[in-house]
């Protein structure tokens, strides 16, 4: 047997670097909500308007000596009595996000309330007829201008500014047809007329 020829030495293969994992996508920074500062709001109401607001505010004053103060819990009610329609989240924001237990104990005077009213009145984003119809069209599975009453009831009770069962019943009274469907264009007209 002939002697084995030594095998030529192979050049060592360069070490393959492990591929680096793809960098994590930058997480979007959570939007920092600007704290509401009543002192930064310029009150632009006329003296007559302010007098009218003061009168309405005083109707909610339950202090023993009529000190022109209301509880935090009453703030949304006063805003609504003055023609505004803020969400509960908006009311909580202008109040500085108080704890639930502070709502009935903390008080606010008229001078502090006025900038809050100004802010709410300037930022209100009232939906138009078209906005509401477009929003309900999402639930129109047949494309025939109607939505299922049961589905609309569920949405009104569980999404956004949730309504109570009684509020939903009042809102939908006489709106459903024999099949339990609601013509949503007529429904929006009905809501906006009230």
From Swiss-Prot:
Residues 1-39 are annotated as: Disordered. Residues 1-35 have a biased composition (Basic and acidic residues). GO terms for cellular component: myosin II complex. CDD domains: EFh. The keyword Iron-sulfur does not apply. Coiled coil: none annotated. Keywords: Motor protein, Muscle protein, Myosin, Repeat. InterPro entries: CALM/Myosin/TropC-like, EF-hand-dom_pair, EF_hand_dom. The modification Blocked amino end (Pro) is found at residue 2. The keyword Repeat applies. Residues 48-85, 127-162, 162-194 form the EF-hand domain. GO terms for molecular function: calcium ion binding. Myosin is a hexamer of 2 heavy chains and 4 light chains. This is Myosin light chain 1, cardiac muscle. It comes from Gallus gallus.
């Amino acid at each position: 047997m002939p002697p084995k020829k030594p095998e030529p030495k192979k050049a060592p293969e360069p070490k393959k670097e492990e591929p680096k994992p793809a960098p994590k996508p930058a997480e979007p920074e959570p939007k920092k909500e600007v704290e509401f500062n009543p002192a930064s709001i310029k009150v632009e109401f006329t003296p007559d308007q302010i007098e009218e607001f003061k009168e309405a505010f005083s109707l909610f004053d339950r202090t023993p000596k009529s000190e022109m103060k209301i509880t935090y819990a009453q703030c949304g009610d006063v805003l609504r009595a003055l023609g505004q329609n803020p969400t509960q989240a908006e009311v909580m924001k202008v109040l500085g996000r108080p704890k639930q237990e502070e709502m009935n104990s903390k008080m606010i005077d008229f001078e502090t309330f006025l900038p809050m009213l100004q802010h709410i009145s300037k930022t209100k984003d009232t939906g138009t007829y078209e906005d509401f119809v477009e929003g309900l069209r999402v639930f129109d599975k047949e494309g025939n201008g109607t939505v299922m009453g049961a589905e609309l009831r569920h949405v009104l009770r569980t999404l956004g500014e949730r309504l109570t069962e009684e509020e939903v019943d009042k809102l939908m009274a006489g709106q459903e047809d024999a099949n339990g469907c609601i013509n949503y264009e007529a429904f929006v007209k009905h809501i906006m007329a009230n």
